[in-house]
Amino acid sequence: MKKEHHSPWPDSLKEFIGRCIQDAEENSQPELEDEVKLLISRQYEMGNIWNVDWSSMNLESLRKLTNAQNTIIEDKKRKVEKPVSGNQFSLLSEEDEVDKKEKRRRRFENGSRSQNNAKSEELKVNPENGAIIGRSTELEKRYLRLTSAPDPDTVRPLPVLKQTLELLKKKWKEEKNYAYICDQFKSLRQDLTVQRIQNEFSVLVYEIHARIALEKGDVGEYNQCQTQLFHLYSFGIPGNTKEFLAYRILYMLFTKNRSEMNSLLANLKEEDKTNAAVTHALEVRSAMATGDYYKFFHLYLVAPNMGGYLMDLFIERERVQAMIMMCKAYRPSLTMEFLANTLAFEEMEDCVNFFRSCNAVYDSKDPNRILMKESTDRFEKCMKKHAVVDIKGQI
């Protein structure tokens, strides 16, 4: 007995139609709707509407099924039910058809609106260098290495970066949190770089970060700033060029980079040599070259600006070298007080720790004296630790 159905269309068919319509809309192929309508009409004509497993059907399998059935009945004569007209059969009800048109209209409007928004939020480009111009207004931003093209929404433009610098200067003065400050300065520098901002403000940022890094002994970060500064200076951008030229000379003494030092000296201008900081750095170089440790340690105590911080990087090495020379020049021993003054120690405790780290030999009769001959090999062994310079130095 034929099963009666209250609805002319199975629920699974309605779901199948919905899937097909969605696919057609997502793939922008409205002609697929007409094909689905035609294929389902053929199944209706053949009386198969309730026999097909619509839940597992897709458009391709429906095509194959319909084609196979058409082949089977091609030569058979049978009474064909009245074809379904557009009014009798529709993939959607009239209300659904209206909803569908409304959705299409809205999608078109949304598409147009999104295109307009895209145009209104088009990348702003600096006409001078072709770089992007950031849109972010955040004063603080963590530093993250770029793995793709910079997003203007996360990049701060120059006016915001100037506010950021003032905030960082204030926070450094009040909090002295180097980990935070270094991260923020690197983020600031990154925003300058991606926007190709190379001006006096850029120089100021790198100079301030370089000084802070020096103060905290972060050689790696200082060197990055120093390298970029001389790149900016080469464009004629004004800054504290003489101050950082002096630092560069001292840094080369630390790294023992003789080739670069010779190149720098060959390109020095007469006006550079008249600057107090540059003159001091050149005198330090001369004292080291001639082995004049008396002069060297005097210059260490009177280093201008932040030159003392740079000399701190290699002061222990020069103290060991000076002790090797004194061990050969003095016999039999020297007092701790004399050595502390000669080697420019400000605290006797630091002097004691220095000789202890080098395993210096003390006079058993007078613990306040260092035996020169007996300590020679100890200082020479200690000097080997300074043979390789760690120019990375990041903390």
Swiss-Prot record:
For whether the record's keyword set contains Nucleotidyltransferase, the answer is no
- What's in the keyword line of the UniProt record? Cytoplasm, Nucleus, Transcription
Domain of life of the organism in this record?
Eukaryota
Every PCI domain range: 218-384
- Name any GO cellular component annotation: cytosol
| Keyword flag Transcription | yes
Pfam families reported in the protein's UniProt record: SAC3_GANP (PF03399)
- Compartment(s): Cytoplasm; Nucleus
Indicate the transmembrane segments per the record. Answer: none
Q: List every stretch annotated Disordered.
A: 91-127
The secretion signal range is none
Q: Which PANTHER family match?
A: 80 KDA MCM3-ASSOCIATED PROTEIN (PTHR12436), LEUKOCYTE RECEPTOR CLUSTER MEMBER 8 (PTHR12436:SF4)
The record's function comment reads: Required for transcription elongation. May also be involved in pre-mRNA splicing.
The family line of this record is: Belongs to the THP3 family.
Q: What is this protein called?
A: THP3 homolog C2A9.11c
